[in-house]
Amino acid sequence: MSLLTEVETYVLSIVPSGPLKAEIAQRLEDVFAGKNTDLEALMEWLKTRPILSPLTKGILGFVFTLTVPSERGLQRRRFVQNALNGNGDPNNMDRAVKLYRKLKREITFHGAKEVALSYSTGALASCMGLIYNRMGTVTTEVAFGLVCATCEQIADSQHRSHRQMVTTTNPLIRHENRMVLASTTAKAMEQMAGSSEQAAEAMEVASQARHMVQAMRTIGTHPSSSAGLKDDLLENLQAYQKRMGVQMQRFK
């Protein structure tokens, strides 16, 4: 796996799924391929994106700044600086300085990532802030190691929280989660279906599922009534894909 592929993988792992994630993935690909060279416009676009947390925006802004060639005197953006200040905690700043000194001695991406993984997310963000604000310089490869270590920590905590939700025994939360998943699967089916004739059936199934979820939410139903809803949808989706000769495993 190339360095930029690895960076893209880690950064996208902390972006919530949805149309915005696809948009960000495209922007990252363009930036890494040297197709997008207008850093100012890119940062303005990033600043106004909804849903993303300030820290995620800060990390993306840092990656764009590292990658897109820009004029020397280009102004640093406040929304990135605020996100990478370690919540203003002086302890984070102290640790960030110690980490920065260690990173100065590293020359490889993996070496930097290993060193960074032993620090807290706040210290890692502060260290990115130091580099972003030009208070310190490291090689691009080392900076990317720092980015990926930060993303790994964030993704780990998101995964723990997601696992807690999936394994919860609370029937109401499980019921709502099944309905949300059915709804998002239906949306994905509609997007994939396109305008071909064979797509009509998939669209119909997706539409029925969405109406069913709406009705269940409106009238209120027993928590077990949603069991199997998403699985039925996925079965329909896979049958449709086979007929279309498409094999997409990513909805499993």
Curated annotation (Swiss-Prot):
Its main location: virion. It is found in: Virion membrane; Host nucleus. Residues 165-252 are annotated as: RNP-binding. Keywords: Host nucleus, Membrane, RNA-binding, Viral matrix protein, Virion. The keyword Cell membrane does not apply. It is a peripheral membrane protein. GO terms for biological process: viral budding from plasma membrane. The keyword RNA-binding applies. Gene3D superfamilies: 1.10.10.180, 1.20.91.10. InterPro entries: Flu_matrix_M1 (IPR036039), Flu_matrix_M1_C (IPR013188), Flu_matrix_M1_N (IPR001561), Flu_matrix_M1_N_sub1 (IPR015423), Flu_matrix_M1_N_sub2 (IPR015799), INFV_M1 (IPR037533). One of its GO terms (molecular function) is RNA binding. Pfam families: Flu_M1 (PF00598), Flu_M1_C (PF08289). GO terms for cellular component: host cell nucleus; membrane; virion membrane. A motif (Nuclear localization signal) lies at residues 101-105. SUPFAM superfamilies: Influenza virus matrix protein M1 (SSF48145). Residues 1-164 are annotated as: Membrane-binding. Belongs to the influenza viruses Matrix protein M1 family. Homodimer and homomultimer. Interacts with NEP. Binds ribonucleocapsid by both interacting with genomic RNA and NP protein. May interact with HA and NA. Cannot bind NP without genomic RNA. Plays critical roles in virus replication, from virus entry and uncoating to assembly and budding of the virus particle. M1 binding to ribonucleocapsids (RNPs) in nucleus seems to inhibit viral transcription. Interaction of viral NEP with M1-RNP is thought to promote nuclear export of the complex, which is targeted to the virion assembly site at the apical plasma membrane in polarized epithelial cells. Interactions with NA and HA may bring M1, a non-raft-associated protein, into lipid rafts. Forms a continuous shell on the inner side of the lipid bilayer in virion, where it binds the RNP. Determines the virion's shape: spherical or filamentous. Clinical isolates of influenza are characterized by the presence of significant proportion of filamentous virions, whereas after multiple passage on eggs or cell culture, virions have only spherical morphology. Filamentous virions are thought to be important to infect neighboring cells, and spherical virions more suited to spread through aerosol between hosts organisms. Most abundant protein in virion. When expressed alone can form virus-like particles in transfected cells. This is Matrix protein 1. It comes from Influenza A virus (strain A/Chicken/Victoria/1/1985 H7N7). The lineage of its organism: Viruses, Riboviria, Orthornavirae, Negarnaviricota, Polyploviricotina.
